[in-house]
Regions:
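Catalytic phosphate-handling regions of large nucleic-acid enzymes and associated NTPases
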Residues: 1-244
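Gly/Lys-enriched N-terminal cap/neck module of very large, oligomeric protein machines
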Residues: 248-292
Length: 292
């Protein structure tokens, strides 16, 4: 029997497609995950930057806040970044501050004047109180971007264009520790010493056909974290470098010093990612901790 819609028009052909719910759910989830991971959560291998960090660096470039210029208020830069990104100002400022924190990045991409936080767990000053510009390494990440070496796409409201990736003259993929947690996917690439990476790259370029991971590890001994610390499972490094997956176990360099009835634990550095907040200090209240 024919069916009629609200306009009393006869509908004679109803095309109903039967689909498998499991297959459709899987496909839709994968499409969603890929969109979130690429657009927000996971750094690109080309420059090892998340989209928000790339937008921040590009904003410094187009506003001429390079390393040789005087820094300007972070709040002003955040406002310019929002033209490229629909993020909130607080989230954008947090991402900007991270690019300047020397205990989180082995080679900071932003130079900041004012309080940008510290290892004690203290947060940064408000954006209206700090000034920022690109660091010299930040300059290198954007060098030659005006020479048609990367693709550009419209921003979210198509009012201007932004780069898909940065030229990345500095090997940020290996030297800049960055991580991301997306949908069913996470990434964490640790930092390495620039001189060691440079030497390894030079060796690889002249020994492409025969170069092995073991050869490269003659130059790159292991990760180089900004806060120091020592790797206690160094024997696993070769497997981690070959597979791209693994766990690094770290501990600080420390001395135990006895003075009469008292004992001091003197820490000389910290494992990467550990801050001296209350959670770290609480178990150590009976000791005198010094020399950080």
């Amino acid at each position: 029997m024919d069916k009629k819609d609200k306009n009393n028009e006869t509908i004679t052909n109803i095309n109903i497609k039967t689909i498998d719910l499991n297959t459709r759910s899987k496909d839709d989830f994968l499409n969603y995950a890929n969109a979130v991971n690429r657009a927000r959560a996971i750094p690109l291998v080309e420059d090892n930057l998340k989209p928000i960090h790339r937008k921040i660096l590009y904003t410094f470039y187009i506003t001429k806040l390079t390393s040789d210029k005087e820094p300007k208020k972070s709040m002003a830069t955040v406002g310019e970044v929002l033209k490229l990104s629909p993020h909130g100002d607080a989230a954008t400022y947090g991402a900007l501050v991270r690019l300047a924190q020397g205990w989180k990045l082995r080679y900071p991409l932003v130079e900041m004047q004012g309080n940008c936080g510290n290892l004690l767990g203290m947060g940064p000053a408000a954006a209206r109180y700090t000034n920022a510009k690109l660091s010299k390494i930040g300059d290198l990440m954007l060098e030659d971007i005006d020479k048609d070496c990367v693709d550009f796409v419209p921003n979210y409201d198509e009012s201007m264009e932004e780069p898909v990736t940065l030229p990345g003259k500095f090997p940020w993929l290996l030297c800049g520790n960055n991580s991301g947690i997306g949908v069913s996917l996470s990434s964490s690439i640790v930092s390495h010493n620039f001189t060691e990476v440079k030497n390894a790259i030079e060796y690889y370029l002249t020994h492409k056909d025969t170069c092995t991971v073991e050869d490269l590890m003659r130059f790159i001994k292991g990760p180089d974290f900004p806060t120091g610390g020592k790797i206690v499972n160094g024997e696993d490094l070769i497997s981690i470098y070959k597979t791209g997956s693994g766990v690094l176990k770290m501990e600080p360099h420390y001395d135990i010093v006895k003075s009469g009835k008292n004992t001091k634990i003197i820490f000389h550095d910290l494992p990467y990612g550990v801050e001296i907040n209350d959670g770290v200090k609480a178990p150590l209240k009976k000791y005198v901790v010094d020399n950080l």
